[in-house]
Amino acid sequence: VAAARRDFYGRLAHEAWHAYAASRLRPAAGHGLPPWLDEGLAQVLESAPLEAGELRLDAADPSRLTALQALLREGRAPPLAAVLRAGGDRFIAGHASAAEDPSHAYLVAWGLAFDLAVTQPLLAPQAVVALGQGGDGDEVARFERLVGVPLETFELQWRRRMAALRPSAAAAVSPAP
């Protein structure tokens, strides 16, 4: 019962994020959040432990972190450019090509969102809105403006940060009441 409750509240937080982002973070002339950021932040919220009545967004999900670190170590993680350019269907199991595993893009999206929201906090409200003003197909350029360095440089640094990241003790706490 406890596991089912955790899963339910995790899914609820994930889907609530999508509803919030669609209604509050879509600029009037924009296209909403890029799929990698929308799915990544939804996962950050989904796995955030509840501690003293507050969500701990700074606690890396141990299972996602371990899986992402294995992908990076084994060279199976998709390049960041591919994840940044991916459409929403890349994150859905039934729509990915046979050569792609959507869970890999999903894990990378989680790692990117966690890094940009927590480890290297760059996701100020204005930055999130700017990322959603896309639609011109230049996702990599918008990302480079956000992080302030070329994607290749960021990717090397990000991979090192993810490899060195350890889950906090709070991450072992239930993500739901």
Regions found by a protein language model. Name each.
Residues 7, 11, 29-176:
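Acidic/His/Gly-enriched intrinsically disordered linker/tail segments
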Residues 1-6, 13-23:
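Active-site scaffold of zinc-dependent metalloenzymes
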